[in-house]
Design a protein with these regions (language model features):
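Acidic, Mg2+-coordinating phosphoryl-transfer loop and its flanking beta/alpha structural elements
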Residues: 179-219
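C-terminal accessory extensions appended to soluble enzyme cores
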Residues: 236-261
Length: 261
């Protein structure tokens, strides 16, 4: 049976963050953006322990058989949450939503990786979908903009779902095997609320990965290209003797008891 794989877009394939910073500089001025960046760097030094404690709490909730605490979902990337006030965020998003076909202006985070994904999916008969919670902007719908962007980057006929709910429930409803995301809370949703396995694309320092991540069976890779290497190995003919999730566990260095039943 072919792999059924879902890819998040922003932070995994598309560089939304850089474009939002650019738009923030247009809106507020570069000096203010630089001050906010300095403030964010100071906060980073004091929030690492808090993040780890939150990860431990999430682990305990799952171990006790309780669902993980719900997180507030919005459309603001984590980096800008640290840098901007709520009022500034709202003003930025109002500005972005007025830009015609904004989602087609983004750069590819890793040039060529989308075309590589398309080639691998075609050769290996993977069923690939793309998940996003992008808000609407002027111009075409967020779905159509995203489809055109993916096609321009080398992925023909992309299946794009603009969704707001739990990634885990979506994975369960679509009977997905693997979900790739750059948000730890989305990966947690996947492993708690579905039978799918989650791979976290974590571009920051490894020491800042939430403590609960690996204990809950979430694989961690540094880049999307690394993720494609792992998927290739999972799907390789030399690994067919073992089960899919055993292959995921082995290739991502997870302990056997770390994968939820």
């Amino acid at each position: 049976m072919p792999l059924r794989i879902a890819f998040d877009l922003d932070g995994v394939l598309a560089d939304m963050e850089s474009e939002l910073v650019h738009q923030a500089e247009i809106l507020f001025g570069a000096p203010m953006t630089h001050r906010l960046q300095a403030r964010a760097a100071d906060r980073d030094q004091t929030t690492t322990v808090v993040a780890e404690d939150s990860g431990d709490a999430a682990t305990e909730a799952v171990v006790d058989g309780q669902p993980a605490a719900e997180t507030t979902l919005d459309n603001t990337p984590p980096l800008l949450k640290l840098k901007m006030t709520s009022r500034q965020q709202r003003k930025l998003w109002k500005h972005v939503e007025a830009i015609e076909n904004f989602w087609e202006t983004l750069a590819e985070l890793e040039p060529g990786v989308i075309e590589r994904l398309a080639t691998m999916a075609a050769e290996r008969r993977w069923e690939v979908i793309f998940l996003t919670k992008r808000p609407q902007t002027a111009g075409s719908t967020a779905q159509v903009q995203t489809q055109r962007w993916l096609k321009a980057k080398g992925f023909p006929l992309p299946s794009v779902f603009v969704v707001q709910g739990s990634r885990g429930r979506i994975a369960a409803a679509l009977d997905l095997h693997i979900v790739i995301d750059d948000r730890p809370e989305n990966c947690l949703d996947v492993v708690v609320d579905s039978k799918a396995r989650a791979i976290l694309v974590w571009r920051e320092e490894e020491k800042h990965v939430p403590a609960a991540t690996r204990r809950l069976g979430i694989g961690v890779v540094k880049t999307t290209a690394d993720c494609l290497d792992v998927l290739s190995e999972i799907d390789s003919t030399t690994s067919q003797r073992s089960g899919l999730f055993d292959r995921v566990r082995r290739l991502l260095g997870l302990k056997e008891d770390s994968l939820p039943a």
